[in-house]
Amino acid sequence: MMLPSVIAPPAMYPSFLRPSSALSLPPALQSAFTTHSSFLVEDLLRISRPAAFMHRSIPSPSASPPATGVTTLNTTSSAVHVAMSTALAKRSSSPQTSISSDPNYLKFGVNAILASTTRNASPPPPVQGMNAKTFPFPCFDGSFHPFIRASYFPASSSAVPIPGTFAWPLTARGKPRRGMLRRAVFSDVQRKALEKMFQKQKYISKPDRKKLATKLGLKDSQVKIWFQNRRMKWRNSKERELLSSGGCREQTLPTKMNPNPDLSDVGKRFEHEAVLRESPRAPFCQSRGDHEFNADLHFKSPSISSKHSDFSESEDEEITVS
């Protein structure tokens, strides 16, 4: 049951439902406004939609008869559709000379613009054939903005496909960074062989280093790093010994005159130096200065110490690695 107050327009605000006389509307629409003006769905659809969308199916005879007001609205809407279609056909068939022959005709007036759009207008496509509105760029794509995080959008959402990780921080920027080397763990046999070679020569050459690495089953870089660390420990201990005996740190560093310093007998050399100062040559050495005397001992000591070390190591058994 339909209420009569809904069908009939209210008496207080008739101007809201009827168009003003200043607007130029087709006669079919004017008749529609004058006959039935209300907020019904039928009237709103009839005004907003073109005639192609307003075709309605005829109810079957087996169905229940509709109400009287609904039947009147259906017949009125069909009459309005027929009137609109005939008006459009007459306007399209009329020549342009009839419009342009009018003395009040303006080339860029409202009537001319509306007439041109009416002539060039094509029938609207069906709703099924209309495509969705596309954007010039994909919204919320992975490459749209790098700072969109997946925490703002659920990963299960199909409307907003956000990748789990972004590819831009994983791109290679030049050479890959070299990782830190793991600390090598040497066995007792390897450590003894390395220590024996270090007692022979503090600065091992490349061929000897490669032979030793192959013999011990190590890498060349591992042997090189072991010798560097061992020389640092040896130099620190000798510095403390030299400083306690009155020497200097420069005696432990390699120079052009002595590229391979060997200070394994620092204590013995300083004892020998004290004996020479107490000998009859002491006044002469004092007159020449202690610097020259120490330098002379510094240059002569490597040969003596190397002979002593070769003699002492010849008695030891050679360490072999299986």
Curated annotation (Swiss-Prot):
GO terms for biological process: cell differentiation in spinal cord; regulation of transcription by RNA polymerase II. Keywords: Developmental protein, DNA-binding, Homeobox, Nucleus. One of its GO terms (molecular function) is DNA-binding transcription factor activity, RNA polymerase II-specific. InterPro entries: H2.0_Homeobox_NeuralPatt, HD, HD_metazoa, Homeobox_CS, Homeodomain-like_sf, HTH_motif. Residues 312-322 have a biased composition (Acidic residues). Residues 238-266, 296-322 are annotated as: Disordered. PROSITE patterns: HOMEOBOX_1, HOMEOBOX_2. It holds the Pfam family Homeodomain. It is found in: Nucleus. The keyword DNA-binding applies. Residues 179-238 bind DNA. The keyword Secreted does not apply. GO terms for cellular component: nucleus. Belongs to the H2.0 homeobox family. This is Homeobox protein DBX1-B.
